[in-house]
Amino acid sequence: MSRHHRPFTWGGAQPGASFSNPTSPTLEASTFGFEPSVPDIYRRAWILVTKDASAELFADTSDADIHLGLLHKLLTSAGGLGPGSAEQIVNSACKGSRCSRSDFYCALGLLHQMQQGEELDVHLVQQRLTMGSLSAPVLDLSDATLNPHSHHTFPPTAPSGPSRIDPRPSTFMREMSDPWNANSSGSYNGIDTRPAYNQYDAMPQQYDTLNSHDSALPAGFAGNVSSGSFERIKFNAGDDRRSHQLLAHNQGSSTDTFLAPDRTEARARQPNTRQERPFSYMSDTAETNAVDAAEDPAADLPEDQVTVRLRSELEGFIIKHNVYIVSSSLRKSQVTRRYSDWLWLAECLVKRYPFRCLPVLPPKRIAMPIAGRHLSADDLFIERRRRGLERFLRMLTCHPMLREDKLVEVFFTEPRPIAEWKSSAPALFLDEEGLIKTVDEAERMSIPEDLQLKLTQQRQAIPELLERWTAMVALFERIVKRNDAAAADYSRLNFSLLSVIETSARRWRPGSDNGKKTEEIMSTMASIFQDHSDTTSSRVSAVSLSTLEGMKAQRDLILSFRDLIGRIDRQLVDPIDMLKKRIEASQKRITTLAASANSNSASIQQEQATLSAQVKQDTQSIQKYLNRRIHAKKTVWEELIWFHHRFKAVEEDMQKFVRDETFFLSTLTRMWEATEMKMKMIR
């Protein structure tokens, strides 16, 4: 199987991300070809500006995006340009709020043009980049010249020691806006989604996403906040305690929205090894059952951190396809999977567990290689799909029943490709769980008498809840994009002000004006603009990796219950009435044959035996389907409880968002106050 490198504009996998980083190059910058040949200085410069991120954030430095300030700093220090010339190159090469690798190479090509005294022509540089004929600019890449990254996070990282919540490795991948924008006429998990929503993230027209900002969200907490933005501010002890309290929000994963609301107590109760836990709610009456419903069925489950990363290489000889790296902390496994493997798993689960809340799969668009391009394989769509696949697996691992399924275990632990495993594995039996499991008396007693009333109430609320939640997610995402665009604009404002200072130094001034107060004030202003940009950029990453992704996970939860209701309506039908009528007809026929004059003949006795066997078989079938009805009721009741506790988990996410937003705004306030005091001291 041949492998080709992903297009050099691709923002691919980073190791171990709880939630991927919301960054991606703009579509205008994407080329979807193979990586062209560039001089070695281009790659060395790119590795330099991403070296701090490569070990922690990205599986491949080619997959990173960088802040515009890093490119500007490289051009002014290593490239020897003035602020005005560097600003001109940045604005020409980078049209969005981030700098992709293709933008970076284009900027270095423009730098070479400027060093040669040529007129800047971005189209010519892009053409040469595609053809692999770029020339090498003069760059001084010594470590003393460029220090591209700081080591600050937002909020600041707490010192080592016990924390309220165990921190997770902080790694990030790109995030895009998560309306899929895919008009799908198919069905997810067995339910046709066309009547209610024609798009995955359908929303009322008044909430249509604004297109005024061509923004791509920034690359993680670390590496965005400049050292100066926090070196200028001294935090008191109260601020330190405050930042320590907020540590859990950024180091944790917002996909914990599927965990218990009180995660601290849940983790304290977690055993080191898995324990069997009966998934039933025993009670004598519906009133007592309401007390049992207060217990979260997933509270004692050991936590499993699942990550899905996209490999930087495409596989396939003729038609290329993406390959994902799936990691599980609980199983200590790391395997490679294709989208078709998710599809296979979803189809198996919907056959085996039709009356459980199954996660939804993101849509798939067929990629056809045409003139070196892969249709529907743009960065935005692939990243949305990767995030959806990760949410799919996280929801599985948070479900008490689904996480223990053998096929789920195979998906997470089988080192071979699923297609190869299926060719050598025994035949799969995908019988519905209600047909092979017997409901005992205790489980029957766990079903509330008013289950139908509860389900009707849920059925009526779900459609409107899904519509409103989807609209809220889209609105919140618009806010995140605007903040990201504002961060980029503050950075560009810093570039412009530095250019003004450079030009202002050449203006005429009277001989008596020997002071440089004006330039110092403008320089201080430019510095606060960049600090504001860095801090806001980190905050955008924090919100995107936590609150926004948590909201999308909750939306998927609601959508999965809507699909469950659809399966209940379609599949909770059985042939019991037909079997009863056939039994009655067979019994009448047996009675008639017994009363006939030739009842002792061999043919009549043979017919009686056949009818008796048919009656026995139909009676067993009726018993099986009756057990299926009871099992379906028990399962639906369990899913109602599980959905309730998963939905309540949003409380903590919103509380953390408010706490972190307060810290962010207070940080900005202190930064501007410090700048005001510094300006007053300028003489």
UniProtKB/Swiss-Prot annotation:
Coiled coil location: none
Mode of membrane association: Peripheral membrane protein
GO molecular function: phosphatidylinositol-3-phosphate binding
GO cellular component: cytosol; endosome; membrane
InterPro entries: PX_dom, PX_dom_sf, SNX8/Mvp1, SNX8/Mvp1_PX, Snx8_BAR_dom
Region (Disordered): 1-25, 246-276
Pfam families: PX, Snx8_BAR_dom
Family recorded in the similarity comment: Belongs to the sorting nexin family.
PANTHER family the UniProt entry points to: SORTING NEXIN MVP1
Protein name stated in the entry: Sorting nexin MVP1
Gene: MVP1
